[in-house]
Regions:
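Short, contiguous acidic/charged loop-to-helix segments that flank catalytic cores in large enzymes
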Residues: 90-98, 128-133
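Short, high-confidence coil segments that cap the C-terminus of an alpha-helix
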Residues: 113-116
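Active-site/acyl-donor-binding loops of N-acyltransferases
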Residues: 118-160
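Flexible, glycine- and charge-enriched loops at secondary-structure boundaries
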Residues: 40, 97, 101, 136
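A conserved beta-strand-loop-helix scaffold within acyl/acetyltransferase catalytic domains
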Residues: 1-95
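Conserved acetyl-CoA-binding loop-helix of GNAT-fold acetyltransferases
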Residues: 95-111
Length: 160
């Protein structure tokens, strides 16, 4: 994966940038979630509010191709040891540029440099399955290519 990402990084038309441009990011997030017939956990206003309420805890990495936003990763700092990739989204019109891979690679580099001990790659589920918590094998495999290990979160419920 490392050699592959290096080749992508050498593309002069691709640029990664840490910024706070939620207005550019949110339409990409909406389109990605719509593919799965779901909506984002947070509205655009909520993301901006969270960023104001918790300064430095939300970190947005945007990916641009020829100046156009084609992807972004929003990371939430959980504590001094853990950062969570909460949303890793791409514009499906640019699959050959592999923005998701670039974004994760840069997030790993950033998290390591910032001294985090753990990088949580987030959930890997199939929201359209009969059980929406069904693991997505292809998404898990994608994440494992970066050296991550999967863990199953078990949900328990009690009916009153």
């Amino acid at each position: 994966k490392r050699r592959y990402v290096r080749q992508l990084q050498e593309n002069p038309d691709l640029r990664l940038e840490w910024n706070k441009n939620y207005d550019e990011y949110y339409p990409i997030l909406l389109r990605n979630k719509a593919k799965h017939k779901v909506t984002p956990t947070h509205s655009l206003d909520e993301l901006k509010k969270l960023d104001r309420l918790f300064p430095g805890q939300l970190n947005l990495l945007m990916c641009y191709y020829k100046g156009k936003p084609i992807g972004g990763t929003l990371n939430f700092t959980a504590n001094s040891r853990v950062v969570i990739i909460f949303y890793n989204m791409i514009d499906d019109n640019y699959p050959e540029l592999q923005p998701a891979s670039l974004q994760i690679w840069e997030t790993i580099r950033w998290a390591h440099g910032a001294g985090f001990k753990y990088l949580d790659f987030g959930v890997s589920q199939l929201p359209l399955a009969e059980n929406p918590l069904t693991p997505s094998k292809s998404l898990i495999l994608f994440k494992e290519h970066f050296g991550s290990r999967n863990m199953i979160r078990k949900a328990m419920g009690k009916q009153f």
